[in-house]
Amino acid sequence: MAELHASLPITLRCGLTLPNRLVKASMSEGISAAGSLPDMKIRNIYQRWAKGGWGMVITGNVQVDDRYLGTANDLAVDSRASDDTIVASWSRWAKVCRQHGTPTLVQLNHPGRQCPIGAGTHGYLSKNVAPTSIGLHMGDGLIPKAVSAIAFGKPRELEIAEIRTITQQFARAARLAYRSGFAGVEIHAAHGYLIDEFLTERTNRRSDAYGGSTERRAKFLIDIISAVRSEVPSSFCVGVTINSVDSVFPEILVDRVRQLELVTSAGVDFIEISGGTFEDPLMFLGPPKPSSSANMEHSEAYFVDFAKVVASKFPDVPLLLTGGFRCRESIEKAVTNGACSMVGIARPAAVNPLLPKTVMFNHEVKDSDATLYSPKIEAPWLIRQMGITALSVHMDNVSSF
């Protein structure tokens, strides 16, 4: 097997050097114990990834406000704990992550309106928060509408003072990650969570400093990046994951590229391209399948078209592309053709935490056999009949943990 471009080191803008370009992308672990701090189960999972030979590991999303979680078992910044208590817990986690030299980043998030009932400490009668009071649309029909109303409710619009508080919560979480010994953080601005809700006109109808124009919709994210940067040294890695947009809608594409101009100028070290929301879970399904073999590149690299646009507009910014990759050849093609600098692998990494060593960079494994296994589980018939897209997706098996 010839040397792969994906196996070559890459140095990010902050000076952090990754030993290769294969990244364990973020996945919500969903096993946090009460208190939202990492326990032995979390450390055991990351101990496996630390041995895998990944270029970088990005943790599952850690919520910056434990009142609002994406699932009831998310890790979060525990509001009941002091900074020193959190650092003591996170330091044990970070020590496991870096024991084999793998750079590990903590992904920071706020779920916004995508906080299901019972997740977090905000109480059953307290509404979720969002840039604008617009509820989730989980599908057409009575059942999807009822599920949306019961599970998520209609969010309330955030006040400016609350937006500023959340901005500082991201900054505090980044400071805690730095003190704990992690190599950096990734700010989650994708998948329909709070920052993505601010970026998108459909979910942000504000007319103040945080909405009404492309630039003002990006203000929340830019303020977060600036606040994070003020709390950590320049050598501490700060990345952003952001949603792809469909290039068939030129005005939306222009808006997103403009927002990325602001993001790159704010001082991020890399950008990750992903996609999907609870309403439209492209992160699981990908875009519509190609109709011909000539377009098979898109059957694996879900968001490759948008990634190519971003790569051409911002050639000096390392680009991480995540979503759909299932074989060595497609990963190598994405890196060599300039679509991205790095490739993110999520669910196959749960099935095989040692994937870089045992498959991707194993010279004894032929290209034809170098597949990234991720079995599918069909949603039960009754769930599929409900018409709720997010429940009907093929959920991959991550029970290997």
From Swiss-Prot:
Recorded superkingdom: Eukaryota
Coiled coil: none
Keyword Oxidoreductase: yes
A GO term, aspect molecular function: FMN binding
UniProt binding sites for substrate: H188, A189, A190, H191
Database matches in Gene3D superfamilies: Aldolase class I
Protein keywords: Flavoprotein, FMN, NADP, Oxidoreductase
EC numbers: 1.-.-.-
Binding site for FMN: A25, S26, M27, S28, Q107, A346, R347
One Pfam family linked to the record: Oxidored_FMN
Recorded family membership: Belongs to the NADH:flavin oxidoreductase/NADH oxidase family.
Its job: NADH-dependent flavin oxidoreductase; part of the gene cluster that mediates the biosynthesis of ilicicolin H, a 4-hydroxy-2-pyridonealkaloid that has potent and broad antifungal activities by inhibiting the mitochondrial respiration chain. The biosynthesis of ilicicolin H starts with formation of the tetramic acid by the hybrid PKS-NRPS synthetase iliA with the partnering trans-enoyl reductase iliB since iliA lacks a designated enoylreductase (ER) domain. The cytochrome P450 monooxygenase iliC then catalyzes the ring expansion of the tetramate to the acyclic 2-pyridone.
UniProt-recorded name of the protein: NADH-dependent flavin oxidoreductase iliE
